[in-house]
Amino acid sequence: MLVLKNKFYLIICLLFQTMIFSQNVTMVDPSNNIGIDKWGIVNDGVMGGISQSNIYLNEANNIIFAGNVSLENNGGFASIRRGFDGNQLKEASKFLLRVKGDGNIYKFRLTMRGSYANYSANFKTIKDQWVDIEIPVENFQPYYFGRSIRAPKLKVQKVNSMGILISDKQEGNFLLEIEHIKAF
């Protein structure tokens, strides 16, 4: 009976450990119907720029973020974003993006409830190659209208939106294919 009790406790402990330490929240995965329906486009047109972008699903059911960044009229950015309930993230310590890019540098951005800042982490793509981008939470830096600011550290449980941005004077056509975005 003692052996049976110990096995029971061991199983409960292992299950509990798995629940705590292997948190895996899929934030974006078109193959599981977590796709583009809640995404919106925000380009530099909000400031007089003329950059253009689009978001759609390709034949592989991956998200495509594509367009053209123009520096005319003091423009220079294109972005997609969507609302997200950070309560699902709880204690996530990193994000994993699986993307195929064009060699450009993109920003993965998060915003928190009650904060005017956005928290960004840059990632570089390799032209026409799939890459897994791992971004620890501590790598996110606070920005306000593209300028680095002093602000509280990112708290993932308060995240209320996420997005992808191309900026930093990377003029021309761009294309980013997103297979998934996950939090661990």
Set out the residue ranges of the language-model regions.
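Beta-rich carbohydrate-recognition modules and glycan-binding surfaces
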Residues: 2, 21-184
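Bacterial Sec-dependent N-terminal signal peptides
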Residues: 1-25
